[in-house]
């Protein structure tokens, strides 16, 4: 065993193997360009633009903010205890958005649902149901992925739209069930 180890060590450390290994390593090292570090330009507080404005180069982006105003419309939550009265017994069609706090696409579509709730005020009610807190209702209606938007009318599930879809897709679904 010791002689086999010595033989393999002798083969690995032969001058010919070392010379060819160091030559190929040197070739590989020369192929990598030297690092110049990471460069960045900090945003000025009074500027709405990132990056070099004159150059109009890559990575420039616009940063928008509304100061002192919350422009989003909060969609009320429905729970297991309020489901019957708010959704099943509603006189108007109801759009229910199934969501979870950890779901990125749910956060993307939430402002769209808020906007639609304002546009269809008096014709449609909009609620959201947290599937983590109310798994019974989600499984009762076959929700397998979120976000899922369901439309209920007269206590019956009428339509479902799955995913963070464009506003026009939700409008097309809503228009089938609202009074004109």
From Swiss-Prot:
- What residues does the transit peptide encompass? 1-64
Instruction: List cystine links.
Output: 103-106
The keyword Chloroplast is assigned to this record = yes
Question: Its function?
Answer: Probable thiol-disulfide oxidoreductase that may be involved in the redox regulation of chloroplastic enzymes.
User: Where's it found, cell-wise?
Assistant: Plastid, Chloroplast
**Into which family does the record put it?**
Belongs to the thioredoxin family. Plant M-type subfamily.
| Keyword terms of this UniProt record | Chloroplast, Disulfide bond, Electron transport, Plastid, Redox-active center, Transit peptide, Transport
Q: Which GO terms describe its cellular component?
A: chloroplast; cytoplasm
**InterPro entries xref list:** Thioredoxin, Thioredoxin-like_sf, Thioredoxin_CS, Thioredoxin_domain
Q: Does the keyword Transport apply?
A: yes
Q: Which GO terms describe its molecular function?
A: protein-disulfide reductase activity
Coarse class of the protein's main subcellular location: plastid
| UniProt source species | Oryza sativa subsp. japonica
**What's the name of the protein?**
Thioredoxin M2, chloroplastic
Q: Which residues form the active site?
A: 103 (nucleophile), 106 (nucleophile)
Q: Which residues form the Thioredoxin domain?
A: 65-179
Sorted alphabetically, which Pfam families does this protein's record hold?
Thioredoxin
Q: Where is this site: Contributes to redox potential value?
A: 104-105
